[in-house]
Curated annotation (Swiss-Prot):
Top-level taxon in the UniProt lineage: Bacteria
Annotated GO biological process: Mo-molybdopterin cofactor biosynthetic process
Keyword Cytoplasm: yes
Catalytic site positions: 107
Protein's name in the database: Sulfur carrier protein FdhD
This protein's encoding gene: fdhD
GO cellular component terms listed in the entry, alphabetical order: cytoplasm
Organism: Staphylococcus aureus (strain MRSA252)
Compartments reported by the entry: Cytoplasm
PANTHER family, per the entry: FORMATE DEHYDROGENASE, SULFUR CARRIER PROTEIN FDHD
Amino acid sequence: MNKDVSLGQPIVRYEDGKLFNTTDQYVTEFPLTIMVNGEEFATVICSPTNLEELVIGFLASEGAILKRDELKSVLIDDSKGFAHVELNKDLGDRFQYSTKRMIASCCGKSREFYFQNDAAVAKTSMSKITLTPQQIINMMTRLQSASHIYQETGGLHNAALSDGLTFFVHRQDIGRHNALDKLYGFCIQRHITVRDKVLIFSGRISSEILIKAAKIGVGVILSKSAPTTLAVTLANDLNITAVGFIRNGGFNIYSHPERIIDSEQ
């Protein structure tokens, strides 16, 4: 069962020279502890929606699973904040950490963890998809118009997957990584191949987000914000087209521009 993503709370507002009582929408932070084969794996701070997708996508992003068939069962106990996962295999030595991990909603993992575990799971894109400039602008416009909770609270990241024409999944979360993990989990649950799909994202394209996109397997990532230098380097290395600053009818292509074609061609 999904809990409320946002809740109305009393506040004091200052406007037009006056203080007055009113209500405002706060986004909900929900700690979810993931247990794998009876052992604590991680605690993720997230929005309390689509939690099974989040758990599956998170485990796949971490390299704990590679496909749906490796999952024996996933039980979400949202009343207690636990996800109980049983796998059809052992986790292996590299997941036997001496300390428990908490993945915060606002940031990624340490650089040491990123290089040791993430690089092995990232995929070089073999995507053949091409997009016109108008398709890019239309997809970003649709993402922003579909994000009604963000418009109410200003506190959620939004992400979607598209074939270039329509969205087939759209997810929101307080954590940018979580929003992408929910997309990933959705695809794994349904055995959806994402090689020729587009990731549309509301946040900045950091190196960690680029790596996450590579893990999911997309060939194009679109954002209304700019990428970092390391993200562009990784995008070039992993054959991913990164497009940013999509606003006011324009955008910048930072890597592999061959997938963006003139609409008149």
